[in-house]
Amino acid sequence: MTKVLFVKANNRPAEQAVSVKLYEAFLASYKEAHPNDTVVELDLYKEELPYVGVDMINGTFKAGKGFDLTEEEAKAVAVADKYLNQFLEADKVVFGFPLWNLTIPAVLHTYIDYLNRAGKTFKYTPEGPVGLIGDKKIALLNARGGVYSEGPAAEVEMAVKYVASMMGFFGATNMETVVIEGHNQFPDKAEEIITAGLEEAAKVANKF
């Protein structure tokens, strides 16, 4: 049975957040099209995700080498392992997130930090790092009020670029991206822009 992990990184209600509308539309369409799949939702704002620090960094390194961990290191590693293992066990992973201040919410960055583990999501080789999750399907769902796909703002977009870059670093080669943008920049076209994006999300979800 296919396991699908939906990672939500926005705790605003759907009526206030286009990225949440996008996430919910994709989720509903996916469930309808894939009724036999096991779907797990991970709402990052409902989790306790401590920032990566000395205990987690030292602990994950020592654990990888088989060294003994301090009590605090063991606790930190257990937190990271919980989310890393869940990610690795999923056949497909869907990320729903907004662009805030040109990048992703801090909670999503912290979550991705947990996934970034040598020997698990990538490995070192003499030729450089090699990703290890190549067979995992990834979907990125993003909303941003301005236009960042082209024009002067394109070079400062660090939300989709960052998540896609990290998944690529982990070896993902099968990625779908649905972006709704410009609804704040062009308020007279906002309804049209959002509707088109939600329709696109439903189409992608059906085939994902």
Swiss-Prot record:
Pfam families: Flavodoxin_2
Catalysed reaction equations from the record: 2 a quinone + NADH + H(+) = 2 a 1,4-benzosemiquinone + NAD(+); N,N-dimethyl-1,4-phenylenediamine + anthranilate + 2 NAD(+) = 2-(4-dimethylaminophenyl)diazenylbenzoate + 2 NADH + 2 H(+)
Molecular-function annotations in GO: electron transfer activity; FMN binding; oxidoreductase activity, acting on NAD(P)H as acceptor; oxidoreductase activity, acting on NAD(P)H, quinone or similar compound as acceptor
Source organism superkingdom: Bacteria
SUPFAM superfamilies: Flavoproteins
Record keywords, A-Z: Flavoprotein, FMN, NAD, Oxidoreductase
Enzyme Commission code(s) on record: 1.6.5.-, 1.7.1.17
Cofactor(s) this protein cannot do without: FMN
NCBIfam families: PRK13556.1
Quaternary structure and interacting proteins, as annotated: Homodimer.
PANTHER family in the cross-refs: FMN-DEPENDENT NADH-AZOREDUCTASE 1 (PTHR43741), FMN-DEPENDENT NADH:QUINONE OXIDOREDUCTASE (PTHR43741:SF4)
Protein name in the entry: FMN-dependent NADH:quinone oxidoreductase 4
Gene of this entry: azoR4
